């Protein structure tokens, strides 16, 4: 919880990879939105080609998720690793998420829908760590300043 420096929007990981994002905190407790939540959307990339997309979960199996918005011109290979891309303050780049299991066309016809097997075993998950980004506030202030000057 907050007594230990945990705040909403902090990344949560385990030894296997990404678990989720801190959603709410109190003095001594935290609630996490796991990647196994239909409202979760994590920015990610393919390790081999470095094309980026979004990780989503669509109910069902606790070891399967999907990567969307990968362009059809991207080189995607089975068993390629999906990892965080570092585009936000929540997760640094390179934290493993899962392996490509199946590649198919998405309904929009311009991107892939990639089924992945998650590295994190949620059925046996016990210990997690929270990622602290000490430069997060500085980055947010700079982005706000840039937005204000743009207007």
In which residue ranges do the predicted regions lie?
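A secondary-structure micro-motif
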Residues: 1-151
